[in-house]
Swiss-Prot record:
Ranges of biased composition (kind: Polar residues): 1-20
Main localisation: nucleus
GO cellular component: mediator complex
Organism: Caenorhabditis briggsae
Protein name: Mediator of RNA polymerase II transcription subunit 10
Amino acid sequence: MDPNSPMFQNTPQQPMSLQRSVDDRIDRERTAKKEKDDEKKKQEDEKILQLEKKLEEFQENARFIGDLASNFQTKYQDALNGRIYTLIRGLQDLDRMKGTFSDKNVPLDILPYLDDGKNPLLYSKHCMEKTLEKNKAVNGKIEMYKKFRAHLIKEFSEEMPDFVIEYRKERGQ
């Protein structure tokens, strides 16, 4: 027998090594995807932290300007002008940053909650409660339609039994 014949070419070791290489490749792809996803999440978190920092700076500048304006004295004019300029630069920075958050959607209904100083999580809670109420109402309607259908089939089976038998055959019931 010739060792180069096809009978000797497919040894059990080849499929095992082939399977290992496929498994290794899959593991490498999964690891690379996980690393890529982690890096993307890290970048998103950094963008959000940067936005939070800018918003806090803006809020602090606005508060300080309010204090200066409410107790205005001419000797504080330069400080007030500097803070107004800083506020304008902060708004420009926020305007430049808006492009990095174009894929984020914020519901406009949350703004009254924020204006009232409420926690945004209350908005989420109220949305969930509304959704649960709507789901209960829809589930109630579904149950009513099921009962109506059962009652209708019962009445039809008494009046037109052949029709109901044919209907059930077509529906596979």
